[in-house]
Amino acid sequence: MAEEPVVIGDPAPRTRKWPIVVGVVVVVLIAAGAGFWVWHEQPSFCAAICHTPMDEYLETYEQEAGTAGVDKWGNEVANTNAMLAVSHKAQGKDCMACHVPTLSEQMSEGMNWVTGNYVYPLEERDTEMLTEARGVDADEFCLNESCHNLTRDDLIKATSDMEFNPHQPQHGEIECSECHKAHRASVMYCTQCHSEAEVPEGWLTVAEANKLSTAA
């Protein structure tokens, strides 16, 4: 059969390009979202978005382990290992390992930041406050398979050679965060009554910690 003649000036057949455009936009959005999510889990994200209240916390996290440093208030710390932010970083943990976000918590904190409804430096949070939004027991915050795979009894045995065993609940069970601090030097709780209790390197007695907290 003879081919139909092409008339000069006729428009070329139109192709539908919108599926390609939509596909490209979707790919770009997915890539951008994935990149943002990765950045969201980095310590630098905290200070970049919430610059004012978070700078000091990022600075404590970024310090080298086992050296002299400073806490979130700028006070000298004899050994940065006394701050959980530093010792956890040395074990490959980042901010999100402890500060596990929930949508309701993030929305609330975001509104407080936008409106300026927060104290500065930020109010210290204990393990109960850190787990409240997730409905997790305070003990489970630290004692779990991905962090410290131990029980309370294991902890008692681990420090049984100390004259005043900080994990022995003879005066009632206390939260881990009563002694172990993230962005300031940890505190030997036993010194509240026993001034002769052994204080780990870089840690503070209760009296020393109270003095710094009051000054801040």
UniProtKB/Swiss-Prot annotation:
Q: What is one cellular component GO term in this UniProt entry? A: plasma membrane
Q: How does it sit in the membrane?
A: Single-pass membrane protein
Localization: Cell membrane
Q: Does the keyword Protease apply?
A: no
SUPFAM superfamilies noted in UniProt: Multiheme cytochromes
- Annotated positions binding heme 2: 95, 98-99
MF GO annotations = metal ion binding
From the record, what ranges are coiled-coil? Answer: none
**Could you tell me which InterPro entries the record lists for this protein?**
Multihaem_cyt_sf, Tetrahaem_cytochrome
So where does heme 5 get bound? 190, 193-194
Instruction: Please give the start and end residues of each transmembrane region.
Output: 18-38
Q: Which residues bind heme 1?
A: 46, 50-51
Amino acids binding heme 3? 142, 147-148
For this UniProt record, the keywords arranged alphabetically read as follows: Cell membrane, Electron transport, Heme, Iron, Membrane, Metal-binding, Transmembrane, Transmembrane helix, Transport
Q: Where does heme 4 bind?
A: 176, 179-180
Q: Does the keyword Iron apply?
A: yes
What PROSITE patterns would the database entry show?
MULTIHEME_CYTC
Q: How is it modified after translation?
A: Binds 5 heme groups per subunit.
Q: Which Pfam families does the protein's record reference?
A: Cytochrom_c3_2
Q: How does it assemble?
A: May form a membrane-associated complex with Cgr2.
Q: What does this protein do?
A: Probably transfers electrons from a membrane-associated electron donor (e.g. the membrane quinone pool) to the [4Fe-4S] cluster of the Cgr2 reductase via its covalently bound heme groups.
Q: Which family does it belong to?
A: Belongs to the multiheme cytochrome c family.
Protein name per its UniProtKB record: Cytochrome c-type protein Cgr1
Lineage of the source organism?
Bacteria, Bacillati, Actinomycetota, Coriobacteriia, Eggerthellales
**Gene encoding it?**
cgr1
